[in-house]
């Protein structure tokens, strides 16, 4: 470190996580420079320059015990974290420090968490499908390799369980490296996830970065960037990497807290005025280049189940596929509780997924939409008042609805049913048989919580 890097300043004000530090006027730190409290590992990140040598910083750690007059040193560079293979199999915090008690991370390469998004001419769009083994996702909202996917849902409809199943199915099949960023979620879930990865022997291919619910807003705001920086490094080395974020809403919420602490005027619903810019900075970096790809799966909490809330609404525009989880479907006991009429994907195009897949998807959605329209009539007048065609549509729709459910590997301990991975060909074949009327003679309960259509036929035999 040069002597210029060790310019010292003094704390002049502490308000919660916001710390004002005074430096000599001719050597003020730059925006996003990392400052370190003398005699401790506490890091502060410069957010504003107030003039007269004073900078306003956000504390990346607990501010307990801080007081005016303490000495702070300027590192003269942004927060940098270790990247590369030494991070695999490790749990790190927002600063890239290990928190798994397995010794230091022996990485020679570090990288700043603030990077520019790749230039337009470096991007590489892909239409190659990524099979997940989850019927409703592969059929209704297929994922693209190198694409961005959002799992939208309110509290308790299964975002994290769906995310875990996707990790289980894709990360194990994929065989490449994955990065998991736990942004403001429960520590218990982070612990469960670590042990899940360890038990399935894929931990040596996953880097875990956690900034959990109990941490200060600065940590939760920056931890997504820490995880993304690690994923970008693997991509720039020419690898195809999976990047999981749980939960992108907590990133926004941390931004709101920081914004309020910094004294900015709030915008709609109390969110920060820079919401779109902050989300754009993060999302534009999650992209595939000619060197390698980042396939990203992000859980997005929907406050009060309102998809028009500014936070989920801002996220929508950045995604290639949106998987919307519905409380109404969850209340029917159908899991995964994916809404097949609300969920979309840019891959739903006959030129990308093929004519057969496209037509089956649209026919399934038409049948379900017809059932949705008829539900009020059924509630008031009953099934008997429907025409024979409508009765048939309703029967098929109810079978489709149940066939969209599936037992998950990660939920085996709760359900007692072994998890099922259903290949895309089997998914298309099963739904084709239902919409073509080849399963009209089977009872609808035979389709609930099965994998392939053959299992539904076997279950029907047991029922009858």
Curated annotation (Swiss-Prot):
It is a peripheral membrane protein. ATP binds at residues 153-160. Keywords: ATP synthesis, ATP-binding, Cell inner membrane, Cell membrane, CF(1), Hydrogen ion transport, Ion transport, Membrane, Nucleotide-binding, Translocase, Transport. It comes from the Bacteria. The keyword Cell membrane applies. It holds the Pfam family ATP-synt_VA_C. It catalyses: ATP + H2O + 4 H(+)(in) = ADP + phosphate + 5 H(+)(out). HAMAP family: ATP_synth_beta_bact. NCBIfam families: atpD (TIGR01039). PANTHER family: ATP SYNTHASE, ATP SYNTHASE SUBUNIT BETA, MITOCHONDRIAL. F-type ATPases have 2 components, CF(1) - the catalytic core - and CF(0) - the membrane proton channel. CF(1) has five subunits: alpha(3), beta(3), gamma(1), delta(1), epsilon(1). CF(0) has three main subunits: a(1), b(2) and c(9-12). The alpha and beta chains form an alternating ring which encloses part of the gamma chain. CF(1) is attached to CF(0) by a central stalk formed by the gamma and epsilon chains, while a peripheral stalk is formed by the delta and b chains. Produces ATP from ADP in the presence of a proton gradient across the membrane. The catalytic sites are hosted primarily by the beta subunits. This is ATP synthase subunit beta. It comes from Burkholderia lata (strain ATCC 17760 / DSM 23089 / LMG 22485 / NCIMB 9086 / R18194 / 383).
């Amino acid at each position: 470190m040069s002597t210029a890097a060790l310019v010292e300043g003094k704390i002049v004000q502490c308000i919660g996580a916001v710390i004002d530090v005074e430096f000599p006027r001719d050597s003020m730190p730059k925006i996003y420079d990392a400052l370190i409290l003398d005699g401790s590992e506490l890091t502060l990140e410069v957010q504003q320059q107030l003039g007269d040598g004073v900078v306003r910083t956000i504390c990346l750690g607990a501010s307990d015990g801080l007081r005016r007059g303490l000495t702070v040193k300027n590192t003269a560079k942004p927060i940098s974290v270790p990247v590369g293979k030494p991070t695999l199999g490790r749990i790190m915090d927002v600063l890239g420090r290990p928190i798994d008690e397995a010794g230091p991370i022996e990485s020679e390469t570090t990288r700043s968490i603030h990077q520019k998004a790749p230039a337009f001419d470096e991007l590489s769009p892909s239409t190659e499908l990524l099979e997940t083994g989850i019927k409703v996702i592969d059929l209704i909202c297929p994922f693209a390799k190198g694409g961005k996917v959002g799992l939208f849902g309110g509290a308790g409809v299964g975002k994290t369980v769906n995310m875990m199943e996707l990790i289980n199915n894709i990360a194990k099949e994929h065989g490449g490296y994955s990065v998991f960023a736990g942004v403001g979620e429960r520590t218990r879930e982070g612990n469960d996830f670590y042990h899940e990865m360890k038990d399935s022997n894929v931990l040596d291919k996953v880097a875990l970065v956690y900034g959990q619910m109990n941490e200060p807003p600065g940590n939760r705001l920056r931890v997504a960037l820490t995880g993304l920086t690690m994923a970008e490094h693997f991509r720039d080395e020419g690898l195809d990497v999976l990047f999981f974020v749980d939960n992108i809403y907590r990133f926004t919420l941390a931004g709101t807290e920081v914004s309020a602490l910094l004294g900015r005027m709030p915008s709609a619903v109390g969110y920060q005025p820079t919401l779109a810019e902050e989300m754009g900075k993060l999302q534009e970096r999650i992209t595939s280049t000619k060197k390698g790809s980042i396939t990203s799966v992000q859980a997005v909490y929907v406050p009060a189940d309102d998809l028009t809330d500014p936070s989920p609404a801002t996220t929508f525009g950045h995604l290639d596929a949106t998987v919307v989880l519905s409380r109404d479907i969850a209340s029917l006991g159908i899991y995964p509780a994916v809404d097949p009429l609300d969920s979309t994907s840019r891959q739903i195009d006959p030129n990308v997924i093929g004519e057969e897949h496209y037509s089956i998807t649209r026919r399934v959605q038409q049948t379900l939409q017809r059932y949705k329209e008829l539900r009020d009539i059924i509630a008031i007048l009953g099934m008997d008042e429907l025409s024979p065609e409508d009765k048939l549509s309703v029967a098929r729709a109810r079978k489709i609805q149940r066939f969209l459910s599936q037992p998950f590997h990660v939920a085996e301990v709760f359900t007692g049913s072994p998890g099922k991975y259903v290949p895309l060909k089997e998914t298309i074949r099963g739904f084709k048989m239902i919409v073509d009327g080849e399963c009209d003679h089977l009872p609808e309960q035979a389709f609930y919580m099965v994998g392939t259509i053959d299992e539904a036929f076997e279950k029907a035999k047991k029922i009858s």
